[in-house]
UniProtKB/Swiss-Prot annotation:
GO cellular component, one term: mitochondrion
Location within or outside the cell: Mitochondrion
Transit peptide: 1-58
Designated name of the protein: Elongation factor G, mitochondrial
Name of the coding gene: MEF1
GO molecular function, one term: GTP binding
Annotated keywords: Elongation factor, GTP-binding, Mitochondrion, Nucleotide-binding, Protein biosynthesis, Transit peptide
Highest taxon of the lineage: Eukaryota
Its job: Mitochondrial GTPase that catalyzes the GTP-dependent ribosomal translocation step during translation elongation. During this step, the ribosome changes from the pre-translocational (PRE) to the post-translocational (POST) state as the newly formed A-site-bound peptidyl-tRNA and P-site-bound deacylated tRNA move to the P and E sites, respectively. Catalyzes the coordinated movement of the two tRNA molecules, the mRNA and conformational changes in the ribosome.
């Protein structure tokens, strides 16, 4: 085997420092699932003994912390039962919920097609773009097969007999892992739920809601292009929901394939510690197989479409030194993020296969490391090993913490009182704390007998009505059961329950905790929580980005009911697709994440609803904001004979940063004390503030990034009303807005261009003409990748220009980054145009 690399200097001092660090480091940061009433570890002493001593300490500490956190927040009547039975454990440890995500054209759907073939879910392999008149199974929409891209995420499930990292027992080392030695001594059947997601940034909401409900992910990267713009977006989404991932470097057969450069990009661009668990045997056209660095075997795909695996202990001589070097690198990377591996490294002790595999699993589940697999999906190589990695290193549903807010009146009241007490004797602070107190958060357990808790994460219009995709986090969902929508309070019967296999369905009678399913006939919205009615729990929904582009749409001929029906359906399915009617022009305006996003919906209206439409020129989603604080003291007073209108408000507005978790960037803050404004008028003030945000004074676009603080005011016993205070607040905002240095914001895009090296100068020149700022350039043998920041308003027509500049050989992608102030000359032009337009109306 391979010798551990020696530490350079000061060996004895390094040992002392490392041991001191080990003694003071806590393992409680590892994701640990604890059952409240009875932990699986407490009821499985044999499994508990099989864990390392440090893991036992970690489990005990985590159990105590979880109990301490859960107990005071709520009373026993609101505590969900969370007893995991042996049957639950046996089912959960062999289950994985994973998503396959990547930049566009990295080979996600091609990879998923091979996964379905090797697991026996499909009888033959079909390619993307419908080259064989069939098309990939997961791209079931006609538009997807025509364009060769995934537009909607698609769910499926399969079973896989996984080869463990070692033929001997593999102890996980994670407190929540209850997989016994017997389980790992031979191949075991794993049940895998898979969601194949789009790679185009315009459909990023599909990735967002998939990752919200998944326990792990496969991040696919191209061996040539490496980390690209959408790869960075997907990485950010995975971090938002703490989703562990393994990495799969695809297209190892392509000219210019360089997995080591890609691994370097994972570490440097994504800031994720990573190392290969395989090295390639050959490259490009000669890519032949891989060497497993953990089991120390050469692995080859043979037989019909690579279905047979041949393994040998004979490592090709020309790859032996590289294999030793990369295995040492793997150990070094793990030693940087795992304390047990650090201790072995310092002591110069070679880890066993079991210890190495356990360290990979431990650090992967903690989102501290990503093992990297290699292969070529199109050449049917390396896919089975990646599947083994999914089963070996990604968590089961019991190992991923899930929580829900207790919205019961008793729990929320108790939380409010505790927050008020913590604020001290200051009555104003106590009232504010009571108002802003968050509901208590309870841990969920994937126990089949626990009260049902599930999250609806995706809606589709099916042949038999609305199809609602749901992840069951706790309890059991059964066909015919009554379930309760936590948002609306309505109860509904589940008439039909199915498992999805792309667009095919398999009827089932029940779905257990940790599973993904779909329901027919259940009206709801994306992000709704469902329970069995015995609890009042609600889960947090997913992050929804704001649209960045709009266009006017008009049906050809007479407007029909189908036009409205299509728009309503698309809005319900896709939270990033928005529709409104412009009050001035009376035009129907659709908004989305990009030109392709809106183009797809316009085409779907024609095909699915027989409503051809004409569209106007795309409009950029400009916004307005303020740059400094400004005070207001505004009185709305109107006398018309009889009861008049009177309302006085005082306070200030100030800039507000966007909340990275929720995306919220506007807020109304009531700090009125003493009843100077009666409580009944406060909600009217809030409505007036949000009325004023709809149109800014500079360009008529929506105002964002503002906090409105209401401090004082006055009311009249006869003339004051809700309308008076609503108008007073809107007037106060407009008055303060002019003093707060308002600016117009425009969407800034991160643009990535890939083209042959001979066109580099022309591409850079074109982006400079569009006022782009180049942030990164990477040159390879015969092509280059250029990253720049360009205003969306300057990107219209770029696709045609790039084709002309590169003779059709260049391609680009762009992703929304942020809104930034426009240049002052542009702001003046936009302001003058808006003023002129307003004057003409009068």
């Amino acid at each position: 085997m391979v010798a551990i690399p020696r530490v350079a200097a000061a060996r004895s001092l390094a040992r002392q420092l490392a041991r001191q660090s080990l003694r003071t480091t806590s393992f409680a940061s590892a994701p640990v699932r604890i059952a409240i009433a009875s932990t699986p570890l407490a009821r499985s002493p044999s499994s508990f003994r099989s864990l390392s001593s440090s893991t036992r300490r970690s489990a005990a500490a985590a159990a105590a912390a979880a109990a301490a956190k859960a107990t005071p927040a709520h009373d026993d009547s609101h505590t969900p039962m969370a007893v995991l039975t042996e049957a639950d454990l046996g089912r959960l440890v062999r289950q994985r919920n994973v998503g396959i995500s990547a930049h566009i054209d990295s080979g996600k759907t091609t990879l998923t097609e091979r996964v379905l073939f090797y697991t026996g879910r499909i009888k033959d392999i079909h390619e993307v773009r419908g080259r064989d008149a069939v098309g990939a199974k997961m791209d079931h929409m006609e538009l997807e097969r025509e364009k060769g891209i995934t537009i909607q995420s698609a769910a499926t499930y399969c079973s896989w007999k996984a080869t463990p990292p070692t033929e001997k027992a593999s102890v996980s080392g994670d407190a929540a892992n209850v997989e016994s030695k017997e389980l790992m001594e031979k191949k075991q059947d794993f049940h895998i739920n898979i969601i194949d997601t789009p790679g185009h940034v315009d459909f990023t909401i599909e990735v967002e809601r998939a990752l919200r409900v998944l326990d792990g992910a496969v991040l696919v990267l191209c061996a040539v292009s490496g980390v690209q713009s959408q790869t960075i977006t997907v990485d950010r989404q995975m971090r938002r929901y703490s989703v562990p991932r393994i990495s799969f470097i695809n297209k190892m057969d392509r000219a210019g394939a360089n997995p080591w450069r890609v691994i370097g990009q994972i570490r440097n661009k994504l800031k994720m510690p990573a190392a290969a668990v395989q090295i390639p045997i050959g490259a490009e056209d000669d890519f032949n197989g891989v060497i497993d660095l953990i089991r120390w075997k050469a692995v080859y795909n043979e037989g019909h479409k690579g279905i047979d695996i041949r393994e040998t202990d004979e490592i090709p001589a020309e790859y032996l030194e590289l294999a030793k070097q990369k295995r040492a690198e793997l150990i070094e990377q793990l030693a940087e993020v795992d304390d047990e591996m650090t201790e072995m490294f310092i002591e110069e002790r070679e880890p066993t296969i079991e210890e190495l595999a356990a360290a990979i699993r431990r650090t992967t589940i903690r989102c501290q490391f990503s093992p990297v697999f290699l292969g070529s999906a199109i050449k049917n190589k390396g896919v089975q090993a990646m599947l083994d990695g999914v089963c070996s290193y990604l968590p089961n549903p019991a190992e991923v913490p899930a929580t829900a807010m207790d919205m019961s009146s008793a729990a929320t009241k108790k939380a409010a009182e505790e927050a008020a007490q913590a604020a001290g004797e200051d009555q104003e602070a106590a009232a504010e704390a009571r108002k802003n107190a968050a509901p208590p958060v309870l841990p969920l357990s994937p126990a089949s007998e626990a009260p049902l808790v599930g999250l609806a994460f995706k809606l589709e219009e099916g042949k038999y009505g609305q199809l609602t995709y749901m992840r069951v986090y706790q309890g059991t969902l059964k066909r015919g059961n009554l379930i309760f929508n936590a948002r609306t309070g309505k109860k509904v019967k589940v008439p039909r329950l199915v498992r999805m296999h792309s667009n095919d369905m398999e009827d089932v009678d029940e779905i257990g905790a940790g599973e993904i399913c779909a329901m027919f006939g259940v009206e709801c919205s994306s992000g709704d929580t469902f329970t069995d009615g015995t609890t009042q729990l609600s889960m947090t929904s997913m992050f929804v980005p704001e649209p960045v582009i709009s266009l006017a749409i008009t049906p050809e001929g007479k407007e029909s009911q189908n036009f409205s029906r299509a728009l309503n359906r698309f809005q319900k399915e896709d939270p990033t697709f928005r529709v409104h009617v412009d009050k001035e022009s009376n035009e129907t305006i659709i908004s989305g994440m990009g030109e392709l996003h809106l183009e797809i919906y316009v085409e779907r209206m024609r095909r699915e609803y027989n409503v051809p439409c004409t569209t106007g020129k795309p409009r950029v989603a400009f916004r307005e904001t303020i740059e400094k604080k400004a005070t207001f003291a505004y009185t709305h007073k109107k006398q018309t004979g009889g009861a008049g209108q009177f309302g006085r408000v005082m306070g200030y507005i100030e800039p507000m940063e966007v909340d990275p978790e929720t995306g919220v960037d506007t807020a109304f803050d009531n700090r009125v004390v003493g009843g100077s404004i009666p409580n009944g008028y406060i909600s009217a003030c809030e409505k007036g503030f949000y009325d004023a945000l709809e149109k800014g004074a500079l360009s008529g676009h929506a105002v964002t990034g503002v906090r409105f603080v209401l401090e004082d005011g006055a009311a009249h016993s006869v003339d004051s009303s809700e309308l008076a205070f609503r108008l007073a607040t809107a007037g106060a905002f407009r008055e303060a807005y002019q003093k707060a240095n308002p600016v117009i914001l425009e969407p800034k895009m991160t643009v990535e261009v890939v083209a042959p090296i001979e066109f580099q100068g022309a591409v850079i020149g074109a982006l400079n003409q569009r006022k782009g700022t180049i942030s990164d350039t990477e040159v390879r043998e015969d092509e280059f990748t250029l990253t720049a920041e360009v205003s969306l308003n300057d990107m219209f027509g770029y696709s045609s220009q790039l084709r002309g500049l590169t003779q059709g050989k260049g391609e680009f992608s762009m992703e929304y980054k942020c809104h930034t102030p426009v240049m002052m000359n542009i702001q003046k032009e936009m302001h003058e145009a808006y003023r002129k337009k307003q004057t003409e109306k009068k």
